[in-house]
Each structure stands twice: as C-alpha cells, then as structure tokens.
C-alpha cells in the first residue's frame, strides 16, 4: 500500500515528538529480567529468602518429580490452565512452531506426581547456545500445584540443567511495567525472586508516513 508504519526505539525521549505517537496496548516489552548462572556451584545463592525456602521444600518432598515432555503433552496440559483462550491458543501455536524450528534446543518440563503422567505445572524454555542464554517461553500451574513448591522446583531445575549445558544467562523475558495488563503482576513478582536483574526500555514511538514513490 501507499503507507508505511515506522517504529522508533528512543533511549532518551520519554514523550513522542510531533508526528509520532505511542501505540495503545503496544506488544513490545518495556521491562525484561534475567539471572546470571555461575559456571559451577550453587545457582540459588542470590535468590530471595522465600524462594530459598520453597527450594528446600521442593528438595525435601518425594511425591513430585520433574520430567521432560514432548510438545503435544505440554500443550495438552497447558490448555487446562486458567489463562484466556487467546493466550492459550497463541502460546500453543508458538510452542509447536519452536519445536519444529529449534528441535532439541526447546526444553519442555513438567511436574508430575510420581507414578502418574498427569502434569500439574510446566515450563517451556529455549536455549540459544551461541550466546549461552536460555529464554523463558511459557509456564503454567494447574490447581493441583497451587499448594506445592512446583513452580520454584521448575525454576531450580531450569537453572541447574542450564548450568550443565554451559548456559550463563537465564532470561525471564517480560515483566510488568506501568501501563501493562495487571494480570502480569503476580507472575512478575514470582520471577523477580531468583537473583533477577532488570532492563527497562522506553516506550516505542510510531509514525505513519506515505511511502515514497
């Protein structure tokens, strides 16, 4: 068509100049977080006191274990979580695409009760070995996991297995920033407990301009 949308990531301006605007409900991240993983030794030393206690509970219990899942099984149980239909559909499609494109770089972990195959919580991560980074893709928790340390157990498993694969950064991806949907707040608080360091970005500016002939 004759029109183009231009995107400008400004590092200094907080407000758009004349002719530019901030898109409502912009999908671009404005805050991300990551944790550094040591080459050897404990991965939990920088965790919050609460996360450390939950890790101890996970290690002390014997009823639950973490297994690696295939994409179909992960998506089957992910579809049972309390997220919106649109979010479930979007992340399910994303997981299936990544499984085809990245194969063994995609890791899908599930918490199950020993002796069963019913997944009560899950975590999807994608390794980027070229930069020694592992990226958080999605996670879920069903009602059966709410009174258990399953989510913290999954993060501990992610950190430890990443360390064994030579990963040095576990990237939690997006965090709540002012103006985002309030539904982000709870999971953002959870992800903030693991020695997380944050990167904040200015809002992106947009401009609609006629395409040059």
Regions found by a protein language model. Give the residues of each.
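Aromatic (often tryptophan-rich) hydrophobic motifs at membrane interfaces
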Residues: 105-210
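Terminal substrate-recognition subdomain of acyl/acetyltransferases
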Residues: 2-60, 174-213
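A conserved beta-strand-loop-helix scaffold within acyl/acetyltransferase catalytic domains
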Residues: 20-145, 161
